[in-house]
Amino acid sequence: MLDTSIQALINKWQKYLVLQRNYSNHTVISYNNDLKHFLEFMNYYNSELVTINHIKTADIRLIRSWLAKRNCDNFAASSISRGLSAVKNFYRFLEKTTQLNSHIIFSIKSPKKTKLLPKALSEDDVVISLEHIEEYGNIKWVELRNKALLVLIYASGLRISEALSITKLHLQNLEFIRIIGKGSKERIIPWLPIAKNLITQYLEILPYKLGDNEPIFRGKQGKKLQPPVFNRELIKLKHFYGLPQHLTAHSFRHSFASHLLEHGADLRSLQALLGHKSLSTTQNYTKTSIKHLEAVYTTAYPIKK
């Protein structure tokens, strides 16, 4: 249970993340859960209901104790790191909106995360997915929606949150899509005719009227389609056709990157298409590509020991 003044601050912070920082709903929900976990621990640590003053005067021992508690509770390093980032983000918001200055939390470094290589699908698995995704909608417009969305993600390398934010205004430009991604970073991606044509066909039979600024991909009740709903469609596809366990909407973004790299795309162009802030993030795909080449070499090279 939180003090009403603290809850009001959290509500303002969430609006700030969405409206000014352009964070996805998924990120905002995760950050909110992390912050509440931190405040619940603070409540336990202080043995009294947390106040604004408790938050402002939280010392390094409390923060390190919270991180240690998460570690003891078997949170992954990535989850602990994200949790600390969420709480730091909240404190930055407090600096902007209250009298708080230079809190000790900013001196704490995040734990090192184990870097996992992105998992791409094979080109054959992508083809199977694109050919059969329409089988799982039960309603014609939903079937076409599923195919249009999946083709869009694979053809453009969009994050699922970015793809689900596409509006009719995006369709008005014949040559490219202008995307506002993580951290309000803008990038421009060429339209592939197959993706645009499928979206146009889908909109022609969509039973809901939409304004130019409304997201075009809708759920069965007419509300904006949410990532978990679409991923459930992919789970059906995965199980029926025996596709890899790591098949999700995001794996098609990874596949877009890996397949372009395997077919000769350069890293700088790939970085621009994916919207990566750092080239080192994009370079992870070269490691995946090298593993692919090693596998091909091992199975196909005519001279073996």
Curated annotation (Swiss-Prot):
Q: What quaternary structure, including any partners, is listed in this protein's UniProt entry?
A: Forms a cyclic heterotetrameric complex composed of two molecules of XerC and two molecules of XerD.
Function (record text): Site-specific tyrosine recombinase, which acts by catalyzing the cutting and rejoining of the recombining DNA molecules. The XerC-XerD complex is essential to convert dimers of the bacterial chromosome into monomers to permit their segregation at cell division. It also contributes to the segregational stability of plasmids.
The record's Gene Ontology cellular component field reads:
cytoplasm
Encoded by which gene? Answer: xerC
Q: Which family is it part of?
A: Belongs to the 'phage' integrase family. XerC subfamily.
Q: Which UniProt keywords apply?
A: Cell cycle, Cell division, Chromosome partition, Cytoplasm, DNA integration, DNA recombination, DNA-binding
Residue numbers annotated as active site: R159, K182, H250, R253, H276, Y285 (o-(3'-phospho-dna)-tyrosine intermediate)
| UniProt GO BP | cell division; chromosome segregation; DNA transposition
Q: Tyr recombinase domain: from which residue to which, for each copy?
A: 116-298
Task: From the Swiss-Prot or TrEMBL record, give the protein name.
Answer: Tyrosine recombinase XerC
**Where is this chain's protein located in or outside the cell?**
Cytoplasm
> From what organism does this protein derive?
Rickettsia rickettsii (strain Sheila Smith)
Q: Pfam families recorded for this chain? A: Phage_int_SAM_1, Phage_integrase
Name the PROSITE patterns on file. CB, TYR_RECOMBINASE
Which GO molecular function entries does the Swiss-Prot or TrEMBL record give? DNA binding; tyrosine-based site-specific recombinase activity
Which residue range or ranges hold the Core-binding (CB) domain? 4-95
